[in-house]
Amino acid sequence: MPDILIRPETPADAAAISALTTAAFANAEHSDGTEAQIIERLRAADALLLSLVAIQDGHIIGHAAYSNVTIGGQDLGWVGLGPVSVAPTRQAGGVGSALIREGLSRLKTSRKGCFVLGDPGYYARFGFAVTPGLTYPGVLPEYFMALRWDGAPPQGEVAYHPAFTG
């Protein structure tokens, strides 16, 4: 990936991130079309723990959001990954992977682990795996995965920030 810069979002990036996210999920069969609104609600609630953009030739071509999650109603130091958006013309080219790896690298010293809801075939390459004792309501267990950095794996029901449900 030549000449791609990954950096935290700035306030000036918000509109481009929204447009990118809408385009990235436009034809995704698993999408309900609310990903851009989720990011906007997380931003408005000051709940984006980390929001990274990938820039090439002055344009945002990718974005990854990370926000706190609760387990059993408690903040145990875990974070949730998502949404992750890549421009349709750049998908399957490593941009999303680069954003995820950078975000995980930045968070692993300050958080205990990360959750993701998504394709196990994709997210396993980053170390995500189904973790017994952790649940996320309404999804098949194989699509809800964790990556643990510190301590014993927690148990309980995981909840993303309320911005994910409106």
Regions found by a protein language model. Give the residues of each.
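Conserved active-site alpha-helix within GNAT-family acetyltransferase domains
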Residues: 108-141
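C-terminal "cap" of GNAT-fold acetyltransferases
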Residues: 115, 136-166
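Active-site rim helix/loop that mediates acceptor-substrate recognition in acyltransferases
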Residues: 18, 25-65
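Conserved acetyl-CoA-binding loop-helix of GNAT-fold acetyltransferases
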Residues: 81, 86, 92-105
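Conserved GNAT-family N-acetyltransferase fold
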Residues: 52, 62-64, 79, 84, ...
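A short beta-loop-alpha structural element at the N-terminal edge
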Residues: 4-17
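A conserved beta-turn-beta hairpin within the catalytic core of GNAT-like acetyltransferases
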Residues: 69-80, 91
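Hydrophobic pocket/interface hotspot
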Residues: 17, 21, 123
